[in-house]
Each structure stands twice: as C-alpha cells, then as structure tokens.
Design a protein with these regions (language model features):
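PP2C/PPM-type serine/threonine phosphatase catalytic domain
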Residues: 1-151
Length: 151
C-alpha cells in the first residue's frame, strides 16, 4: 500500500492487515486533515473495520459498521464537523478479490504490465466526469479535486 501526505504537513493515514488461513484483508484510511482529528478518525475506522472482519462480517458490512460507530463517536464528542476519513478495504481469498471504499483512496489492479484503476472516486470532479461535463484527464487539476461527496 502506498500513502503520501501530499501537500499537507502530516500524513493522517492509518492502515492495517488481517491475515487468516483462508483470506487476507487490507484496510487503508486517509484522515481528512483539513477538518481536524483526521488521524483519530482514520485509526478509529481502521480498528473498527478490523474487529468487524474478525467477526466474519463482509467488507461492505464492516465499513457500514465503522461508519455507524464513527457517527456515534462524532456525536458523543461534539465533533460532527471533524473526525472524517476515507476508507478502502480489500479482501483476498484464493483467486478472488473483493473491495469496498468510501472517498478517493483508490484500488488499482496490476494487469498486463500496467496499473488499472478499479475503484471510482466519490469526488466532485468524478461526478462531473460521470455526467460528461469534464474529461477524466481533467480531474487531477480540477479546482475541486479534493472535495469529496462521501467520507
């Protein structure tokens, strides 16, 4: 897994791996630093997903469980406008791969000597691409490239 602080001073990413005899789960959360407590959110969501996966919940169920618990934590700590994170979770089992994500932390597949993006960002520019308003090549430099629709 690759993480980078980008233009920010601190990297608020948190990642973990869960390995069992029949599968491997990889969890990556990228805390939103501009909202405060992104590091808290990324650690909390990663740990919550890991615990849910240990209970044999699916990747999707684990993310929903983490979202529910993060919302409860935000409310309890009066932090509804902070403690935000993206999440990407990949499960490998035999020759099968499943993933789920929220935000703009991407999943790529290395295929035929090149990387192929498998996930689609939950961002304003991606929405504009989907509507046909801009081209995919314009996402990288779009003024709203960091504006997410889901976190």
């Amino acid at each position: 897994m690759l993480t980078s602080s980008g233009e920010r001073k601190a990297n608020e990413d948190f990642l973990d791996v869960l390995i069992s005899s029949d599968r491997q789960d990889f969890i990556l959360c990228d805390g939103l630093g501009g909202h405060g407590n992104g590091d808290v959110a990324s650690r909390f969501v990663t740990e919550t997903i890991k615990e849910a996966l240990k209970k044999e919940m699916s990747v999707e169920e684990s993310i929903m469980e983490a979202q529910k618990k993060l919302l409860e934590k935000q409310k309890a700590e009066h932090a509804e406008n902070s403690m935000k994170t993206t999440v990407t979770c990949l499960e490998l089992s035999g020759s099968k791969a499943k993933f789920a994500h929220v935000g703009d932390s991407r999943i790529y597949h290395f295929e035929k000597a090149k990387y192929v993006q498998r996930s689609q960002d939950h961002s304003v520019p991606q929405m504009l691409v989907n509507r046909g308003d801009i081209k995919e090549k314009d996402i990288r430099h779009h003024e709203d490239r960091s504006r997410l629709l889901r976190v």
